[in-house]
Amino acid sequence: MFELVWTPTATATFAALQAKAQASIDHRARSKRAKASKDEGLFKQVVKCITHLRSNPRHPGLQTHEFHSLPHPYDKAGKVFEAYVQNRTPGAYRLFWCYGPGKNQLTVIAITPHP
């Protein structure tokens, strides 16, 4: 099991997604609707992606692969990886991460719609 380290950008994005999902849950409870919103679904998918990433960064569902357009935050020669939060969706979300800074640590660099 890996320990996660978050960049300020990733922390802010995660908090914003969580707040939108909670607002949707509250609104749904007030209006007595049963169907979950897109914001709730997206947050659930992000949490699932993070869970898989912590337990196994090579989990087949993540479809993890190297991403060359972002610099590694700790090591210029290090690799940055992209994991799928969503698939086959317009503007599908991706999670960018790298190994480090310490042993058994992963850094979540960003959570963004597909670039």
Regions found by a protein language model. Give the residues of each.
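Basic, Lys/Arg-enriched alpha-helical interface segments
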Residues: 1-92, 100-115
